[in-house]
Structure formats: C-alpha cells, structure tokens
Amino acid sequence: MSRSATPALPLHNAQASRPSSRAPVTGVRSPSTSTSTYSLLGPEETAERLQTSLLHGLTPAEAEIRLLRDGPNELPHEEPEPLWLRFLKQFKETLILLLLASAAISFFMGNYDDAVSITLAVTIVVTVGFVQEYRSEKSLEALNRLVPHHAHLIRDVPPSSAPLMNNSTTAALGPDIELEDLASKSPSSASAAIKASSTVLASELVAGDLVLFTTGDRIPADIRITAATDLTIDESNLTGENEPVAKYPEALRSTKAAVSHSPKIVSPPRSPFYDAPASGAVGADIRLNEQHNIAFMGTLVRSGYGQGIVIGTGAKTEFGSISVSLQEIESPRTPLQLSMDRLGQELSYISFGVIALIVVIGLVQGRKLLEMFTIGVSLAVAAIPEGLPIIVTVTLALGVLRMAKRGAIMRRLPSVETLGSVNVVCSDKTGTLTLNHMAVTKMWHFDCPEPFEVHNDISSLTSGPAARTVLRIGNIANNARLSRVSANSPASASSAAVLSSTVDRASGAVKSRWVGQPTDVAILDLLDTFGEDDLRDRISRRVAETPFSSERKWMGVIIGSAQNDAPSFTGANNVAYIKGALEQVLTRCDTYLTKDGREVILDEPRRHTVRQAAEHMASEGLRVLAFASGAVRDTAGGGRVFGSRTSTPLSITSQGDEDDRYTGLVFAGLVGMNDPPRKDVHKSIRRLMAGGVRVIMITGDAESTAVAIAKKLGMPVRDSPGSRPVLTGQDLDRMSTADLAQAISTTSIFARTSPEHKMKIVRALQSRGDVVAMTGDGVNDAPALKKADIGIAMGKLGTDVAKEAADMILTDDDFSTILRAIEQGKGIFYNIQNFITFQLSTSVAALSLVLLSTLLGFKNPLNAMQILWINILMDGPPAQSLGVEPVDPTIMNRPPRSRTARVLTRPLIQRVLTSAFMIMLGTLAIYVYEMGDADDLSTPGKRSRVVTAHDTTMTFTCFVLFDMFNALTCRSESKSVLRGELPLFGNKMFNYAVLGSLFGQACVIYVPFFQRIFQTEPLNAAHLLKLLCVSSTVFWVDEGRKYLNAVKRRRAVGVGYSVNV
C-alpha cells in the first residue's frame, strides 16, 4: 500500500503539470451532472428537490428507506471472481503443469498408480496454495475495515429516541464542532441542532442527509453547501489544485455570480481533472474548480465550518466516476515483500541448478527418464519457496490485526516493517502522555503570598473580588457546553458539584458534564465544584471572538452592552475577556486588580511578581493560564459577529484589529491546572529507553511545567555544561536544522512549541540517521506526521487530516500503545525470520538428501508424492504458525533494527545450514541403515541394498519428524524450551499445526488408501521410537547453541542484565 493510499477511501492525487497561461473560465454552462445541477440551485431549492429539511435533515426512518434503495455510500468495486475459478487458476503454474504432464505420461504408459498419486498430490498442493492466497486477501480486506470513516449529521429524531440512536450506530458529536449560526441565526434553532447532531458511519449516508463538517474533517459524500463560515477545502486530490478553495453557500446563477465568489487564483495548476467537467463531456458542465458551493467526497476541510445536504453517494459522486481508473492501479508491494520476491527468485535459480545436476547424474547412471523427470519437478515444487511472499503478507496482515485489538491501527503494511527500526519517539504531552482532562488545583491573584489550593481554601476563592473575577472571565471566555445527556436533563448548580468530574473506576476515564477544550471544561468544572451557575446565558450577547490557536496562545471574546442590540463590537460599553499564556496576556494589560477589587497600575516590579507566581505553579507541573478583562477600545476594524454565546463567527478580521481590541486590559489573576500522567506511562518510557528508543516530549506548556512533568514520567532531564535538556519554540526559531541536529542529542523536552516546530524537529532527527515516530492530532500536525518515518495520529481527538497523513492511529490516544506497537513490529520481523529459517532449512535438507543419495548411487529415498507432502508441511500450517508466535516480552531489550538490515543475516544462515545438515545426515543414516537390514541371499554375510516400501516409509517419516522438531526450534532464535524461557504450548496455532501434521502423517502410513498413493506401509512402536530418537537430534543441537549463546551474553554484561538499562 502506498504512502498516499487510504484503507477505506482511495484518494486520487492527480499529477499537476505546468501552470496554465490563461485564467480559469468561470462562466456557467448547461449542467448534465448532479453536482453541476445542484450548484445552480439555492439551499431551499436543493432541500425541496431532495425532500429534506435545512434544519432537521431526514428522519431515521426515511434515511433507512433511502439506504435500502440507493445502497451504502461506498465507491464502486469490481465483483470478485468466483472461488471455483480462482481455484482452477492455481493450476496455471508452470511446475504444476509439468507435474500434471508427468501424471498424464504415467497414465498412458500404464502406470496408473503413479498417475493417480501424482494427480492427488498436486491437488493437495494446489489447495494449500489457494487457501493461503485466500487468507492473505481476507486479511488485507480486514485491514481496510480497521479505519471506518464517520460523518457528523443532523437527523430529525424526537428527544425520546435519541438514546436509542446513541446505543446503535451514532454517538455524541465531538466537542470541537460548533454548529450555531450555520443554518440559522436563531440561538434556539442552533441549540436544537447541537442536541440532534450525531456521528454515523460515512457508509450510512444517503442523499438528503444534513451533514456538518469542520476543520480537519474529510468530506464523506458530495455535498451541496447550505451554510459556511470561513470555509476552505483542499481539493488537490481531485483537481490537482494545491491551494485550498474558498467555499460559499450561494448558488451559481450566472457568469457574474461565479466570478464574484471565485477564489483569487489567476493561473491554477493543471491536471487531468482540473479543467475537466463534472463527470460529463468536456465543455458541457461547470468545471469542478468552479463549483464553490459543492464539497466533494474525499476532499479535506482546511479551515472553518460548514453544513450541507448530501446530493450524491458512492458511485454517484465525482470520486465514484473516476474510481474505475483507481481499481486498475495495484498497490505496490512492501520492501520486505520485494526482498522476499528477490530471495525466492535467487533460491529458485540455485534449486534449478541442483535439480538439473541430480537429473543429469541419474540419467548417466542409467535411471529412467520419466522417473528422473518426476523427481526433478517434485523437488522443484518442494525446494522453491513460492509460498514465502504469501506467508510474509499473511504474517504482516495478521500482525496488524493483532495490533488493532491493542489500540494501534496500522494504515499501511510497510509501516509494520519500519516500527522495528524506530529509535526516537516524539510525543505530544497532552492527551498522549497525560489523561487530557485538566483540573484546576491552584489559583493566584495580587495580595496573595503564594498560589493557594482551590479545593482547600474555598473562602478565598468565593469571597474576594479578584478571585470571583478570575472565575467570571474563565466562565465567559469559554466555549465548552453541556454534553447531550446533561443538556437534555440539566442539573442545578448545587447538584452539578456532585455530577461534575467523576471518575469511571472501571475504565479510569474522567467524566464531566461539560464537553469542549480541556482547559474550558476544567474551569466550568471548578464552577460546578463551588455551586456557581454558568453566566453565559444571562449576560449580553457575544459580539466577537478571537479563537485560540497554537501560534496565538490566547483566546478572547467581546460581550456587547445591554443597550446595544446590534451585533457590533464597537459599542461604547463592550467588554473584552481574555485568557491564555501568561506572557501573551500580560503584554495586553496596563493595570491589575487587587484583592479588594481596586485597579492599580501594572508596573514592571509587579509584572515580575506575576511571573514568579507563574513559575512557582509551573515548577509543580501545572499548566498556568492568565486572565484579564476590560473595556474594548474603539477601533475602526471589522469583526466576527455572533448570534449567541457559543456561536461561530460569520466574518473575520485582520490580526492587527484583533490585537488592538484586546489591549489596555485589567489583569485579574492566574490559574494552575493539572493534567495527570496516564497510568503506567512511566513504565512504558523506561521500557522504550531500555530498548534503545529515545523519548522526546513536545508541548506548548512553559519550560518549568514541561520539566516537572518529564520528571514525573521518568524522562532523563540532566542539565550539564554544554548541553540543554529543554529547548523552547523561540530557541528553535533561532536555530538552523544543522544546529538543531547537533543540539538534539542531549535534548529530550521541547516547550512552548507550535505544530510548525515539529517539522523542524523531524528533519533534524532524520538528518542524523534516526528513524522517527511523531504523534499529532491537528491539521497543522499533518506535514510533520507525513514527514516522520511513522506518523501517529490520535484516534479520539485527531482530525481526519492528521489521520490521513499518519501511518498509525491510536484508538485510545495512549502513549503506552506506542510501546505495544513497537513491540509487535519487532516481534513480527523476528517471526518472519523464524519461519524463513524453517522453510529454508527444510528446502536445503530435501535437496541435499536427494543429491547426496544420487551421488552415492542409491535409489531416491523419497518418491514424488512424498516430496510433495513435505512441501505441504513446509509451506502449510507449521510455517504459518511461526509467523504468529506471541511476542517475546524481552524483545524491547534488543536495540532497534537498522533499516538497511538484511533479512538473511549471518546467524540466520548458520542456523539454516546447521539444521539442514542435521536433517539430511539423520534421514540419510536411517535410509542407509534400513536398506541394509536384510541379508543378501546371493552373497552370504552381505547386507542387501534393495529398497523396500518399509525403507522409504522409515526415511519419509524420519524427514517429517525432523521437520516438526525443526519447527519447534525455529519458534525462537534465542529462547530455550528446556530452560522454560519459551512455553512449550505457548503458541496455540503452532500446537494445532503440529498435531494436524502428525495426524496427516499417520494417515499416510496407516490408512490403506493413502498407503497406495504414497507407497508406504505401517510402522510399529519400536520403529517410531527409533525415529523420534534420531529426529530429535536437531532439537538438542539447537538447544545447545542457545545455551552457549546465553552463556556468552551473561559473560559479556557481567551480571546478566541488559547493557541498555
């Protein structure tokens, strides 16, 4: 799967050619497709045509009817071939056809037993290969279902039925989505829309659904936009245009209308789809880049909010019209699969050479041509590991499915290989290393000697004007809202203290009756704790807002005066409320509020006092927020106008205008919040460090806060001359990539950073040769996630843009899941090495046994059917079970694997040759001994060299038992079964595979029907005991190797502990 591919929704990245020299045509032509048609209709006309509502959408019953009628919202795909046809295609392999030709020749020459035996054996081999390929395809299909895409929508559901929806396929809308004023400026209608919003699988969308989308979302279907706020959409995967396109709800009525709303792009990039009409004949439709009121399926929202009506799903979308060309593009194979292909090819050449030598020697010795031909082809089938690439794919896919059950969804198979090479993990602090539930623990304002505990000093918090002002600002400059359950049954302020911020002991998750940004929720939880009511519904309307961003590091709102009903932010009595990072707030304040409520000039000594109080809280690992308020200065700029307290702005102002309005404020105080570390994160960090993986924490918090939290997590924070354990965003701005690459070797914390700094950190680490994993959740994190070797997006809080760029998604947003994923990545690679060892040692042993027997002039010890049976064991369940061996818990003590490391290492080749030699030597010894177990009647005292069915049965069974013991030794390269390091029955699939193989072998030698096919005869208990003693030698020899290696490792480290700890 390619880097740009997505499991559930393939995106087409058109290759942009050189820019066009002419301006885009914006005139409206005669429409012939749904998007073209609806782009000319207004929102009301669109709703009327699709028989839906602009406020409430469809009813669930109507949506169900349309889903049954139109089918799921999925891109068209080719129907798979019937299983019987795919099974017959397995017979197209050259070696299989040669074996069938051998069977046909035997039949015509009267050797009916051989003909039937070869045909049956070939059928068994083909069946095993077919089952393997089928499992591989099903495993890959399961991967595509790991990342289901969702859509936020409004459906007309009565309040009594809402809980039923939540228990089925819907859930409460995420806290980061603002809906008010998108469809109506009425606060009541917006509130109703919020309560009715739901999250459903994108595949369940139908035409007429009312869909909501915001920054970072992927558009789930073709949508006619009915309301938008600062909405821009990235359509590069559809049109090739690199710049996000501004979107508007107005209909394209004429050429003039189209021009007036088009983005200011003089010469957009060209692509096969950019100038193409919407799924119609050239020149007949409105081009895709002109449809500024259509959001196309698969495109990504870069900024703003939007609402619209679904007009096309599945094959009826613009993506659906080009999906046929996508189906013809095969996903590239992973590097490991390509290396297995090359290995198989090289081994094929060697095998053909050895087989040709065997056939030539046999013919020179006067053996029958048909016999040597059949043996040669059978050896080719057994010796050439044609199943190796398939088993690699199955192992990777099954490993990914196991990782998904543990909370890590790998979106691309090559990423599994890279996981074992990761030696640096860059992690966000909030939500990944911590619980992402802030709780206010301390507060400070002037005239306080030091920050006080809010829960221990309730009188200070509720009696003083300064403390009450801090709470008031935190309440007003706040976008958190009641959760759907709390909104439908609101609690009083007195009872909210009991309901707010409870802990679910079963899951460890912290619950609140509020939803929104963690800092906003923490402040409202504090209000609940002290029984204070939410004031936002009782004060004047919010007339403007400056939203928080990682670059700005503060947010502010402007509340209109009671006398000013018009939504203007220039009223004489408007008041600004601001909260954010200390330095950003402090620079906007001229005065401060004393404990008794007086305003005093904020001079430099008092600013220093504020900074000391903030540093005191930050040193305890608290996140510090500053609060201020004051009258709005009269400016001439524009503003963001709102209809209610949590509305989304309808227009935007310049950065300068925003700064001018939030100046000359009164500083109120500080609040310290605590986001506790996740459970066992400190253990995960220690285990990663023990395995040679550095952990770097990236946070927007202050330096002292970051250091305090890092120490709690057990991260190395050592400040020594010439090195700095912490770098800030300002330090990064001043450093070049080369300087950062040099300094980063001693740095484990980056504080006061923005998403843009992540890209610089990744480049610096990669320039040193590090393999980097980077976490992120926002739109601005996407470039760094894509640049990193392993981009890790958050499953709960991450945007669709971040998930699109990532290689791995954490469904629980937990750092410990990264450790489990790296463990699995390492384990999968070593498991692949183990079954390669098993397959190659079996293949080499079979070839060398037949070659040596031929050179010594013996009759072939194994007939064609027996060789094909060995091939089934080599490529079948025993080999596959080695690929799913449980991961060794001590695997993290091994250093990360080099990206250029070969699969076939020197120790692996030595294991292959040792095991193959033991198998060949022991099997040949049994064969020679059994040939001489009877007297030669013509020469008294001389042993007979006549090969009987008993001789070949003993040889055949000896080889199979050798194979089983060899598979047992290949379960681990270093762990011993005898010393109890490797549980004998720890791999259930391996147990079943061995039992099945032994049962099959018993059938071959004891069931009369199979005796005739494989030319065997029954063995007694004494024979089996002798074979067990001989065949177990490969196990004892490998156990001895493991013991000697363990002794060497203990001597190397002195006391038996890993040198990395």
UniProtKB/Swiss-Prot annotation:
PROSITE patterns: ATPASE_E1_E2 (PS00154)
Region spans: Disordered: 1-40
Residues spanning the membrane: 91-109, 115-131, 344-364, 381-401, 838-858, 912-932, 946-968, 990-1010
Upregulation: Expression is induced by the unfolded protein response (UPR) during ER stress.
List of residues binding Mg(2+): 428, 430, 777
Alphabetical UniProt keywords: ATP-binding, Calcium, Golgi apparatus, Hydrolase, Magnesium, Membrane, Metal-binding, Nucleotide-binding, Translocase, Transmembrane, Transmembrane helix, Unfolded protein response, Virulence
Disulfide bonds: none
Binding residues for Ca(2+) 2: 875, 963
Keyword Translocase: yes
Cofactor: Mg(2+)
Cytoplasmic side of membrane: 1-90, 132-343, 402-837, 933-945, 1011-1061
Lumenal side of membrane: 110-114, 365-380, 859-911, 969-989
NCBIfam families referenced in this protein's UniProt entry, alphabetically: ATPase_P-type (TIGR01494)
Family according to the record: Belongs to the cation transport ATPase (P-type) (TC 3.A.3) family.
Membrane topology: Multi-pass membrane protein
UniProt-annotated binding residues for ATP: 430, 520, 579, 623, 752, 758, 780
EC number from the UniProt entry: 7.2.2.10
Cellular localisation: Golgi apparatus membrane
GO molecular function: ABC-type manganese transporter activity; ATP binding; ATP hydrolysis activity; calcium ion binding; P-type calcium transporter activity; P-type manganese transporter activity
Low complexity: compositionally biased ranges: 30-39
InterPro entries named in the record: ATPase_P-typ_cation-transptr_C (IPR006068), ATPase_P-typ_cation-transptr_N (IPR004014), ATPase_P-typ_cyto_dom_N (IPR023299), ATPase_P-typ_P_site (IPR018303), ATPase_P-typ_TM_dom_sf (IPR023298), ATPase_P-typ_transduc_dom_A_sf (IPR008250), HAD-like_sf (IPR036412), HAD_sf (IPR023214)
Stated name of the protein: Calcium-transporting ATPase pmrA
Source species: Aspergillus fumigatus (strain ATCC MYA-4609 / CBS 101355 / FGSC A1100 / Af293) (Neosartorya fumigata)
Enzyme class: translocase
Catalytic activity: Ca(2+)(in) + ATP + H2O = Ca(2+)(out) + ADP + phosphate + H(+)
